[in-house]
């Protein structure tokens, strides 16, 4: 089961995602990112985009994945309310394939909150917790 939460971080807000798998934690942190911007519960899966990134480590993979989603938001005005992720180990690191579904931002419907300017490595962590769940977190630049 994936879930996310926002946490206090000095003048910013952190995004932390949990999942029973690494993929679910990445999905949850992506949804948490968009929930900083809008009410994701009101986003319908009208349009889908596929994202594919490859990186040497999990932190770089998370960064690149979230950056691709933010670029889609900035370029096409999309907000996402559903994300499915597949991660595979490769010879050189990791490969992520994702399908993100949502719709064009409608201020009356989606209740805009904060504007995320950029993805950062600030306070980024990805770890398997003692209870077996995965956690991924970072602090976006608002």
From Swiss-Prot:
<keyword id="KW-0479">Metal-binding</keyword>
<feature type="binding site">
    <location>
        <position position="141"/>
    </location>
    <ligand>
        <name>Ca(2+)</name>
    </ligand>
</feature>
<comment type="similarity">
    <text>Belongs to the archease family.</text>
</comment>
<dbReference type="InterPro" id="IPR036820">
    <property type="entry name" value="Archease_dom_sf"/>
</dbReference>
<dbReference type="GO" id="GO:0006388">
    <property type="term" value="P:tRNA splicing, via endonucleolytic cleavage and ligation"/>
</dbReference>
<keyword id="KW-0819">tRNA processing</keyword>
<dbReference type="InterPro" id="IPR002804">
    <property type="entry name" value="Archease"/>
</dbReference>
<keyword id="KW-0106">Calcium</keyword>
<dbReference type="Pfam" id="PF01951">
    <property type="entry name" value="Archease"/>
</dbReference>
<dbReference type="GO" id="GO:0005509">
    <property type="term" value="F:calcium ion binding"/>
</dbReference>
<comment type="function">
    <text>Activates the tRNA-splicing ligase complex by facilitating the enzymatic turnover of catalytic subunit RtcB. Acts by promoting the guanylylation of RtcB, a key intermediate step in tRNA ligation. Can also alter the NTP specificity of RtcB such that ATP, dGTP or ITP is used efficiently.</text>
</comment>
<protein>
    <recommendedName>
        <fullName>Protein archease</fullName>
    </recommendedName>
</protein>
<dbReference type="InterPro" id="IPR023572">
    <property type="entry name" value="Archease_dom"/>
</dbReference>
<feature type="binding site">
    <location>
        <position position="12"/>
    </location>
    <ligand>
        <name>Ca(2+)</name>
    </ligand>
</feature>
<dbReference type="InterPro" id="IPR022952">
    <property type="entry name" value="Archease_arc"/>
</dbReference>
């Amino acid at each position: 089961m994936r879930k996310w939460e926002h946490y206090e971080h000095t003048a910013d807000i952190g995004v932390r995602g949990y999942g029973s798998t690494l993929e679910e934690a990445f999905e949850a942190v992506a949804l948490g990112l968009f929930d900083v911007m809008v009410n994701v519960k009101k986003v319908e899966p009208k349009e889908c985009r596929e994202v594919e990134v490859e990186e040497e480590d999990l932190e770089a993979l998370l960064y690149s994945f979230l950056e691709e989603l933010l670029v889609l938001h900035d370029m096409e005005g999309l907000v996402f309310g559903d994300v499915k992720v597949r991660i595979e180990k490769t010879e050189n690191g990791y490969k992520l394939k994702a399908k993100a579904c949502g719709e064009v931002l409608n201020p009356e419907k989606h209740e805009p909150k904060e504007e995320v300017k950029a993805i950062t490595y600030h306070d980024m962590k990805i770890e398997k917790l003692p209870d077996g769940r995965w956690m991924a977190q970072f602090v976006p630049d608002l």
